[in-house]
Curated annotation (Swiss-Prot):
UniProt-listed InterPro entries: Creatin/AminoP/Spt16_N, Creatinase/aminopeptidase-like, PepQ_N, Pept_M24, Peptidase_M24B_aminopep-P_CS, X-Pro_dipept-like, X_Pro_dipept
Name of the protein described by the UniProt record: Xaa-Pro dipeptidase
Claim: Manganese is one of the keywords in the record: yes
Alphabetized Pfam families for the sequence: PepQ_N, Peptidase_M24
Cofactor: how and how many bound: Binds 2 manganese ions per subunit.
Keywords: Dipeptidase, Hydrolase, Manganese, Metal-binding, Metalloprotease, Protease
Lineage, uppermost ranks: Bacteria, Pseudomonadati, Pseudomonadota, Gammaproteobacteria, Enterobacterales
GO CC annotation: cytosol
UniProt keyword annotation of Heme present: no
Length: 443
């Protein structure tokens, strides 16, 4: 395996090539990429946690420093103005010296407002990519060159194809997240509350709650029926039945996004259902290959859900085909099979069919699917099927012609467990699929 230094150099070559292409297409001279700024809470002097512009961290693994700027033209060495104030109130990150810094021209920026005097005087043909349009206007960037849609679409489309450097970073993020999942599982087995399980996860990963790529979902019992449950009860429930953990990690700005579900009683019906969802998830991943639409895999898993609903007698006296046709599987798995993953957890361009931004929406029957692209080598996606017992989604089925097929007694018995989700992160290769999560032996 090449060193991170070599991988990064090749990664930069790829970004430079993409930059040359997008500048030529839109007749631009350069891209000015802003890391972002701190924004204060309304009527307060405390800022919100800083979240870096993902287009900025695509170039350099600087994720915690606002007021930084990159100027790239696809030919010359990228220039990074690194914010380095004299400040005794707050910690100041030193000028970076790492595996990547030889490839970047790094200039200290002591005062954020001084960037105007550092940039080229002629800015009429430079595109600003960043979260603060007002700042770009003050720098005399024309309004039509502030986050121009065509440029953003082009950059987003090709972000789906990960470089070897990006894949290496994502594998490292996996390792960190797997450590967290193992620690959280131990905390669950010891009877901890959601709040304390989350602390165990953060300790094992070395992350603060503002460092994780998304808010950890730490759901005990019926809380697992809330897809994005983030409340974190301080008290452990009187009876531990189930635990769903959806939590990730970051490495150099790249995300991992893993989910596991455990049953307190390994001999319960719920534990058997977890086992079967896990087996079907792995079976689906085993069929994945380049050249197939992600939509197809989503539909295929609804067929697998139908099989499990019949096997576990949750839905009875109706064929699997009829179940999928009538969308009886829908209330049990109301989300998509997964999404693109990378610099962002729900990575960009999941619906984009080409580098001009052509959009293909999710099928009307499955509106929450986050990706409609044909899979290609170097794409990274999550595969995260689930079966849930969500009363608000089941209510419409309690009446009508299909109600008789629902085993309501079995469903009521399973509702206190909330639901199941199992999520791995996979890389599409030319001749197969790499399951980064299972490669680390996370059961």
């Amino acid at each position: 395996m090449d060193s991170l230094t070599t991988l990064y150099k090749n990664h930069l070559d790829t970004l430079q090539e993409r930059t040359r292409n997008v500048l030529a297409r839109f007749n631009l001279d350069a891209l000015l990429i802003h890391s972002g700024e701190l924004f204060n809470v309304f009527l307060d002097d405390h800022p919100y946690p800083f979240k870096v512009n993902p287009q900025f961290k695509a170039w350099v693994p600087v994720t915690q420093v606002p007021n930084c700027w990159l100027l790239v033209d696809g030919v010359n060495k990228p220039k990074l103005w690194f914010y380095l104030p004299v400040d005794y109130w707050h910690n100041v990150e030193p000028l970076p010296s790492a595996f990547w810094t030889e490839e970047i021209d790094i200039i200290a920026l002591p005062k954020a407002d001084d960037i105007g005097g550092q940039l080229p005087a002629a800015r009429g043909n430079i595109a600003y990519i960043g979260p603060v349009p007002e700042r770009a206007l003050k720098l005399d960037v024309p309004a039509d060159k502030i986050n121009p849609k065509g440029v953003i679409d082009y950059l987003h489309f090709y972000r789906a194809y990960k470089t070897d450097y990006e894949l290496a970073c994502m594998r490292e993020a996996q390792k960190t997240a797997v450590n967290g999942h193992r620690a959280a599982h131990e905390a669950f087995l010891s009877g901890m509350s959601e709040f304390d399980i989350n602390l165990a996860y953060l300790t094992a990963t070395g992350h603060r709650d503002t460092d994780v790529p998304y808010s950890n979902i730490v759901a005990l019992n019926e809380h697992a029926a809330v897809l994005h449950y983030t409340r974190l009860d301080h008290r452990a429930p009187s009876e531990m039945r189930s635990f769903l953990l959806d939590a990730g990690a970051e490495y150099n700005g790249y995300a991992a996004d893993l989910t596991r579900t455990w049953a307190a009683d390994g001999d319960s019906d719920f534990a058997a259902l977890i086992k079967d969802v896990n087996e079907e998830q792995l079976a689906l991943i085993g069929t994945m290959k380049a050249g197939v639409s992600y939509i197809d895999y989503h539909i295929q898993f609804h067929q697998r859900i139908a099989k499990l609903l019949r096997r576990h007698q949750i839905v009875t006296d109706i064929s699997e085909e009829a179940m999928v046709e009538a969308d009886i599987t829908g209330p049990f798995m109301p989300h998509g099979i997964g999404h693109p993953l990378g610099l962002q957890v729900h990575d960009v361009a999941g619906f984009m069919q080409d580098d001009t931004g052509t959009h293909l929406a999710a099928p009307a029957k499955y509106p929450y699917l986050r990706c409609t692209r044909v899979l290609q080598p170097r794409m990274v996606l999550t595969i995260e099927p689930g079966i849930y017992f969500i009363e608000s989604l089941l209510v419409p089925w309690r009446e009508g012609p299909f109600s008789k097929h629902f085993n309501w007694q079995k469903i009521e018995a399973l509702k206190p467990f909330g639901g199941i989700r199992i999520e791995d992160n996979v890389v599409i290769h030319e001749h197969g699929v790499e399951n980064m999560t299972r490669d680390l032996k996370l059961a």
